[in-house]
UniProtKB/Swiss-Prot annotation:
Keywords annotated in UniProt: Cytoplasm, Hydrolase, Protease, Serine protease
Assembly and interaction partners: Fourteen ClpP subunits assemble into 2 heptameric rings which stack back to back to give a disk-like structure with a central cavity, resembling the structure of eukaryotic proteasomes.
Species whose genome carries this gene: Synechococcus sp. (strain CC9605)
Protein name: ATP-dependent Clp protease proteolytic subunit 2
Main location: cytoplasm
Function: Cleaves peptides in various proteins in a process that requires ATP hydrolysis. Has a chymotrypsin-like activity. Plays a major role in the degradation of misfolded proteins.
CC per GO annotation: cytoplasm; endopeptidase Clp complex
Amino acid sequence: MIPIVIEESGRGERAFDIYSRLLRERIIFLGEAVTSDSANRIVAQMLFLEAEDPEKDIYLYINSPGGSVYDGLGIFDTMQHIKPDVHTVCVGLAASMGAFLLCAGTKGKRSSLQHSRIMIHQPLGGAQGQASDIRIQADEILFLKERLNKELSDRTGQTLDRIQQDTDRDFFMSPTEAMNYGLIDSVIDKRPVQAVA
């Protein structure tokens, strides 16, 4: 069930679902696994916010166990494509593709709340069928692993060898450890007060 927010104005009351209300503040929330549905929703919200004001930052809050690499790369590419800076904030858990998207925010604007957990690892996949089909799937997983590791290396400042070693198995970090690793830029406990224009 999605919570409803009631807003009063001189013209009466209006009801919004909580996500629509947050979107008015340029906040997008990824609070589930990365799927084609969640990715399409997030991409559409980012494109809408860019069209509305390409100069104002977007805030992506992430509490996700990860999910589809392809759908996550769609979000990632959109984050790089749009003009507004994207602040990323981990709330709870950013694991697998969730951690990748957390790290994909604008450099200097990637953060985590203090009790969150962040986990990176290699892409997961499985294959069945004929040997030739299994080889095709294995080659694709290896391609994705190399692509994700290269992006993580570029965005964290860690060597590719270090990223490959650390993503070989689940690698959990506290926010402070993730900051020292280069996945995020700050650990926050209170939202900064926004300047009034």
